[in-house]
């Protein structure tokens, strides 16, 4: 079977390429239905990654957030028509200590390997997680970002002290919003504070205990642990504010990605006995755990709906370009692609 793959060949330039797919291979064949654009995709699209990185990784199909429908499974594990969320991280070995998303041998779709912008995606069976029938697929398209947050929370739980009465979240964007949703469900008795700089973004966090502007933090405010969801150049000031306000022996979970090294007040980290926990991407278990949370707490999906921005029907390469360009001017939420190529 001929498969069409839509690749970024140069900044702002998509082209279609073709490969031959063996439908009787060991993979399950999934037709993408809805996808969502990530900031990492935009760094490739706009050419803002390092030139050496771009030359090594392009041409490449973008997008690592998406849901689809099983069209064929020669192994019979999935029924035709089963809706699944697609897992972008693909391990090539198993390690009893190191998680799959930290193994150097693992590869990640839309980061040196083709992403989900294809007519058909071939997945290992454990890279497809079944979804409930009655769920809104357009909202669930950005589940991968939810798994990144849950993975960070699970890592934090293993490495932090038992005091978990108060949490601070730095970042009023998509990742901060998702992290707040999950912490509210997982720690219903704890207080959650969100720190940001944009009023209309902070207004979405109606379910937390309080929100603060980063330049108007009350004197004497403190919390047990913190989650950094800022990234970019702003992560430096965010991390150092967390260090200033966090209680002794607290943990700071770092989720934001910065293209540049940041300076950290290590003197205060040592003085307070703080733990900094790095976290990146997620694995298939995180996806299954998130889907289980959707089923257990349907209101999580309702809250995630507030993140849905523009939805574009993608039938041509011009539609793709239009969607990526529009997403660049989106200050809140996720751009969704309805895949009808």
UniProtKB/Swiss-Prot annotation:
Chain residues that bind Zn(2+): 38, 64-65, 144
Subunit structure of this chain's protein: Heterodimer together with TarI. Can also form a dimer of heterodimers.
Entries under InterPro entries matching the protein: ADH-like_C, ADH-like_N, GroES-like_sf, NAD(P)-bd_dom_sf, TarJ
Cofactor(s) it depends on: Zn(2+)
GO biological process, alphabetically ordered: cell wall organization; poly(ribitol phosphate) teichoic acid biosynthetic process
Organism (species): Staphylococcus aureus (strain NCTC 8325 / PS 47)
Catalysis: reaction(s): D-ribitol 5-phosphate + NADP(+) = D-ribulose 5-phosphate + NADPH + H(+)
Keyword Phosphoprotein among UniProt keywords: no
Similarity-based family: Belongs to the zinc-containing alcohol dehydrogenase family.
Keywords linked to the UniProt accession: Cell wall biogenesis/degradation, Metal-binding, NADP, Oxidoreductase, Teichoic acid biosynthesis, Zinc
Protein name, per record: Ribulose-5-phosphate reductase 1
Function: Catalyzes the NADPH dependent reduction of D-ribulose 5-phosphate to D-ribitol 5-phosphate.
């Amino acid at each position: 079977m001929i498969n069409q793959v839509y690749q970024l060949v140069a900044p702002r330039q998509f082209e279609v390429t073709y490969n031959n797919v063996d439908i009787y291979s060991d993979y399950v064949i999934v037709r993408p239905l809805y996808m969502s654009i990530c900031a990492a995709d935009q760094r490739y699209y706009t050419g803002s990654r390092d030139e050496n990185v771009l030359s090594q990784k392009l041409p490449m199909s973008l997008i690592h957030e998406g849901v689809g429908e099983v069209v064929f499974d020669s192994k019979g594990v999935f029924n035709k028509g089963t809706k699944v969320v697609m897992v972008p991280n693909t391990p090539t070995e198993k390690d009893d200590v190191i998680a799959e998303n930290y193994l150097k041998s693992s590869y990640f779709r839309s980061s040196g390997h083709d992403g989900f912008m294809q007519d058909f995606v071939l997945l290992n069976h454990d890279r497809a997680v079944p979804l409930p029938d009655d769920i809104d697929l357009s909202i669930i398209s950005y589940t991968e970002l939810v798994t990144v947050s849950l993975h960070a929370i699970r890592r934090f739980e293993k490495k932090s002290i038992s005091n978990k009465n108060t949490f601070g979240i730095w970042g009023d964007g998509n990742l901060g919003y998702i992290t707040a949703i999950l912490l509210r469900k997982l720690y219903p008795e704890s207080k959650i504070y969100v720190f940001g700089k944009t009023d209309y973004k902070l207004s979405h966090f109606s379910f937390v205990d309080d929100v603060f502007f980063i330049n108007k933090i009350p004197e004497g405010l403190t919390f047990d642990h913190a989650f950094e969801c800022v990234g970019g150049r702003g992560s430096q000031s965010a991390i150092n504010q967390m260090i200033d306000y966090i209680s002794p022996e607290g943990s700071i979970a770092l989720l934001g990605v910065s293209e540049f090294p940041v300076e950290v007040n290590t003197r205060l980290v040592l003085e307070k006995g703080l733990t900094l926990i790095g976290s990146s991407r997620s694995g298939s278990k995180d996806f299954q755990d998130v889907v289980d949370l959707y089923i257990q707490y349907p209101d999580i999906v309702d809250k995630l709906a507030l993140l849905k921005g523009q939805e574009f029907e993608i039938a041509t390469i011009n539609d793709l370009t239009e969607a990526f360009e529009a997403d660049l001017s989106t200050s809140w939420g996720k751009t969704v692609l309805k895949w009808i190529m």
